Amino acid sequence: MPTQENAATLEAVERFNAAFNSHDVDLVMDTMTQDCVFDNTNPAPDGLRIEGAAEVRVFWEIFFSANPDAHFEVEEIFAFNDRCVVRWIYRKTKDNHPWHLRGVDIFKIRDGKVAEKLAYVKG
């Protein structure tokens, strides 16, 4: 049986995912804390750490502009206390062809918002 905290954590991550798929930067940022941390998957091998809402906002603005059809599909999601793991497929058009990538995000939730989003990919 899911606990109340687990349910709240899942709800926060589901709000983030819906905001991401809407490409609305204001909605995305409404789901994140002011001191949020986002570890992106690029550049390899370790990705780029982006800290603070202002910097994360700039990242999302550039990202959605460069990836107008970006979409995440959740394959599996589970929460434990303030942590959530999402296994996903990221789809977009690349070089005029459908393209996808599989990965995992590890979220930390605080006060109903994303405080950390750590992204990892296959390949």
Ranges and model annotations:
Residues 37-50, 62-64:
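A short gly/proline-enriched turn/hairpin at secondary-structure junctions
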Residues 50-51, 72:
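A broad, structural micro-motif
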Residues 29, 38-40, 116:
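Hydrophobic residues in well-ordered beta-strands that form the structural core
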Residues 16-19, 39, 92:
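Alpha-helix C-capping/helix-to-loop hinge sites
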Residues 2-8, 24, 57-123:
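A beta-strand edge to alpha-helix "cap/lid" segment located at domain peripheries
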Residues 1-34:
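Short, low-complexity N-terminal intrinsically disordered segments enriched in polar/charged residues
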